[in-house]
Structure formats: structure tokens, C-alpha cells
Amino acid sequence: MTTFFLNRLATEPHALAFAGQSTPWPVALADQTTDPSLDEALRGHVAAANRLLAPVAADLLATTGRPVDLFGFTPNPARLGAAADATASVEGVALTQLGALLDLEHLGYSVAQAKPLAVLGHSQGVLAVHMARAIEAAGSIEAAGKTLDEILAVAALIGAAGTRRVRELGLSPKYGEASPMLSVKGATREQVEALVKRVNNARGPISIAVTNSDNHHVLSGYPEDLAALALEAEREHKHQAKLREQKLHGGTVFNPTLEYLEVTLPFHSPLMAEAVEQTVSWAGACGFDQDRTRALAEEVLLNHVDWNARVKALFNAADPAKLWIVDLGPGNTLGKLIGNVVQGTGIGVVEATTLSERSTLSTLESEPERTQNWKAFAPRVINTPAGAKLVTKFSKLTGKPPVLLPGMTPTTVEPEIVAAAANAGYWAELAGGGQVTAEVFDRHIAALEDELEEGRTVEFNAMFMDRYLWNLQFGSSRIVPKKRASG
């Protein structure tokens, strides 16, 4: 009996993953609303969330300036534009993730029944995590409807409270090209912290908001402070490049990739502490679960996100070679972040961010591609009558232990060490760079013939960086092929 991939997830270890800010949520929403039933359901949830917010509607309107229409933004995969504003984006991202869960249920995948091993939320993706857990607890999306509407409403409160707070702080969402969040890729945490310390007269704290991997961090703060940090990074790059040019410094020159995120708030920053309190206050006026509201607001606005650790925790929860992580978006940025963390583990990262991708998975009989499992290349120990032996690709190819004596002038020009290594059963190379005349070569080969045991072999290592050696060894004189042909 054929079982499609989406159905198989119910019996295989898997995790769901949801993206956060600066992702193309209007594109995802426009895609979802092409399905009439999904469009109707999403509009119904938004209307219900708005009704729940009636007690604080005047406060919200004072912040947004006009009612927010989540369905009215022009989808643009390259740029969010006005849709980046937190008064729309926090709820908008969460809405598309609810849409993905609704679509999965229409296709036969129920979160409540499949019980994923984990549900991961990157940054504000934690809102979708709470949605998924609410569905699991209630048994279905329909049964969890009231909780889902409340979480959507809390998302709107978080965006409005954060926006109100940055205005109180005088934090502009733009300072030239700078925004309140800066991605720094290609730098360790220690290097990032060193750059932070070099920013003089900062207007506020510069915090590491998100740790995507060991060398990819996202900072939050005033845009002008982040712009100053970017200048410090450029100065450090030029300083190290000069030292390298002068041959005073080795290694890789510090050269991180910097990218400002398209956001209007410094998410995951102590600057947002008062916004958390404002969110909880509004939630209380609406009669919401204040403990859950505080937890959500702190996760989105205040707390550091160690995405690297969250993903790696899955390695111990299940056999990585059997685990699937399903990226539900919006956009495919999160799948790339996951891929960077899980490379070499064999974990399968599955993109399910669009109606088309999810539909394909619902009829897929084969398996999606997994990441390469580097354990397949690890050495193995086998027991033989001659004792324990190490097996590698090299040993299978050559029949010799995975240790070699490389041809390197001047060390292996003389034959004694080469013969000793070969007689001990190792791959041994005679350095061609030192065989500078036919007489020298013949003398060394004669010594090898005397010292090598019967059946032992050596390899000739040659790098032809000048025409003389090429002509001597393999060109017109051909001293090496002739010696090989003679046995």
C-alpha cells in the first residue's frame, strides 16, 4: 500500500519549524488566499481577533493611525516595504503560519494526531509554536479556535506595544541604510562582542538578539549604533588585511557579511522591556490569559534566541538520519538557517512554505532529499585475524593503513625513509622534486631496490612547476616511465 510523505510523518520522527521577522509574509498570505476555503478561514480568524481587541481598540488606533488590513499589502518577495511595520508584520507572520497549519490539515496532516517531536519557532515564530501546541491540546484546529484567535490578537498587541515604545525612545526605524536589527555572518560571538565594545557614545544597548549558528549572530539596538558597529567591522577588516599584506599576521582576514533586517523594532532587546508590560496591560483589559501573553511578549520582544542550540537539541531527541524538519515559513530563509546548523547530520530539511510545496508532499511517494550524513565517511574499526584494523576510503582503495609518507622535498628525496615506511606496510612516496638528474634518480632507485622487501611498492610524487624536471622525468627523457617499465 502506498503511503504519501505527508501521511508518513505521523509515524516518523519529525519537527515543524516556523520563521520570524523580516520574512515575506504578504507573499505567503497572497498564496494562501488563492484557496477559497483557506481565504475564508483566515479572514474569519482575523475578524475574531479584532473583536477580542475591542476594549483597547482606541489605544491601538492611536498607535497605528488607521485600521490595519493584513490582506491589503502588495506581495513582493524582494522587499517588505510597508508590510515590515511591526503593527502589521507580527500578526501577519503569525497569520500565515496559522494558514500553513490549516492547509496541512486540509491535506491530511493533523498536528494533534501526528504529534511532532518538536515545534521550533525562530524569533517570533514562537507564536506559531503556541498555536501548534494549542491545537495538540485541544485535539483539532476547530477545537482550538478561541485560543488561536487570542494568540493572533496578542500578536497584534505585541506589534503595537513595540511600536509605541520605540516612539517613546525616539528610535527611528531607519538611519540611512541601517535598521534596528543587523545580521553579522562570519564572526564568532567573541568577535561580535568585541565590536560592540568599540562603539563609543552608543544611544542604547547593543544586544545579541539571535544566535543562528556558531558564526552567525543578529544584533538589536538603535540603528545609528548598529551603523557605528558596521564601521568598526570595516575598520577591523582593513586593519587585518594590512597586517596580512605586510606578512605580520596569518590566517583568515576578518570579513563578516553584514545585512540589515527589514524590521521596525529592535526585537529581543532590553529596549523592549516596557513594551512587554504594555502588552500584558492591554491583554488584561481584553480578558486574555496574562501569563501566556507575558511569555509570548518576552519571547518576541525581550529574550535572546539561541536558534543554534534549539536545533542541535533535536540531535539527541532522535536519530538525525531518520529525522525530518519541515519548514512552514513564511519564505525559505529559515530552511537555509536550519541547513547551516544540521549539515553533515543526515537530517532532512523539507520546504513546505507554499500551497504548491505542501500539495506536492501530500502526494509524494518517495523521500525528499536529506542532508549528507558525514558519519558515512567516518573510519571504522574491524577485527581481523591479524588484529583490529582501521577501515577508511583510503584503506579500501589502496589496501594499506590510512597513514601515508608524502613525497616532500627534501625529506623523502633519499630512499631510506621511503623504503622503511613501505616495508612497514604504509603508502610511501619518493619526492620527485629532488630527483634533479638521471644519475641522482638512478642512484636512489638502486638503493630502493636493495632495501625494499619483495612485493613492496613506492609511489613517485611529482609537481611539474618547471620545464626541466618535466622533460627529465616524463617528457623527452622519460626516466620515470622507463624505470617503471623495467620493473
Identify the residue ranges that each predicted region occupies.
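Acyltransferase/transacylase module recognition
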Residues: M1-P116, P266, P270-R370
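Solvent-exposed alpha-helices and their adjacent loops that cap or buttress functional pockets
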Residues: N7-A10, V111-Q113, P173-G176, N200-N201, ...
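Short polar catalytic/cofactor-binding loops
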Residues: F18-W25, A187-E190, T409-T411
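Gly/Ala-rich beta-loop-alpha elbow adjacent to hydrolase catalytic centers
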Residues: L117-G125, V129
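Alpha/beta catalytic cores of group-transfer enzymes, especially the acyltransferase/condensing modules
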Residues: M131-A295, E299
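Short, aromatic/basic amphipathic alpha-helical patches
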Residues: L195-K197, E232-A233, K336-T345, Q473-V480
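Active-site entrance/lid segments in N-terminal catalytic domains of soluble metabolic enzymes
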Residues: P368-G487
